[in-house]
Amino acid sequence: MKINSPQFNLMHKACMKASKILIRDFGEIEKLQVSEKSPGDFVTASDKRVEKVLIGELEKSEYSFLTEETGSIDGKYKDKRWIIDPIDGTFNFLNGLPHFAISLAYEENGEI
């Protein structure tokens, strides 16, 4: 994907908007609602908020989604999809370690 492609620009805008939530929530970790999906695998209210913002921004493309928290969401274009992990490094995030990221990929015809 080229850096000036429409997909890249949309990804950048979505991540910048979602990162504001992460920065705010990282400063208030003790107030976050946390659930355990499976032993040792946690989901936070921040995961859900970030995913919601990313989907809200990216759904304009009408592509499909594969997300860590929601799963698959079909869009108009089945051969193009966004792959989202809203907080890659949730353990670090929850423990106040600043080593986490929003992971977002664009897949077209099975290639990232």
Q: Language-model segments: what does each one mean?
A:
Residues 76-112:
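DPxDG-like acidic metal-binding loop motif
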Residues 1-87:
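N-terminal subdomain of lithium-sensitive/metallo-dependent phosphomonoesterases centered on the IMPase/IPPase/PAP
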